[in-house]
Amino acid sequence: MQLSKHFKLEEMTKSMTATRKGIDNSPGAGDIKNLENVCYEILEPVRAHFDKPITVTSGYRSEALCEAIGSKKTSQHAKGQAVDFEIAGVPNIQTAYWIQNNCDFDQLILEFYKKDDPAGGWVHVSYNEQGANRKQVLTYDGKSYENGLPDMKWKDGVVVG
């Protein structure tokens, strides 16, 4: 099922853990609508701006899958409202800054960020059509969360050094 021009339901629900453990990771109709919103409001604009394919590492997670990976059942992933992703050749911090400045979102987290590796980790972003999006921005270094994104050196819209 095509969710948007560049994103399919299959890539937004794919999980090696679900496959290995025999967990049904099928979203309901409301979850699918939320995934479509994430695609249209976040992923498609990001893909258009960077003009590169996006690799989704985690989209929808059933409650059973959330439990299996140690995530909260209340995670926005369990509602189809969140996605984790990367773009080959684009530092994740650059992607996160672009989303912060150009998209409506509920929560944006630069996950497992290391200052000496701006391409490390991944971007987590959520979108909530049902309510006001909080525009919460966090950076997680693997130990603790900090408000906002780290300061970076920029030249012509690209992270340097």
Segments the model singles out, each with a brief description of its role:
Residues 44-70:
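Extended, low-complexity, intrinsically disordered C-terminal regulatory tails
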Residues 68-78, 114-116:
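Short, flexible, solvent-exposed loop/turn segments with mixed acidic/basic and small polar residues
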Residues 38-42, 65, 81, 91, ...:
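Amphipathic alpha-helical interface surfaces
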Residues 87-161:
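Catalytic cores and adjacent binding grooves of peptidoglycan-active enzymes
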Residues 54, 83, 122-123:
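A broad, low-specificity signal marking well-ordered, structured residues that form hydrophobic/aromatic
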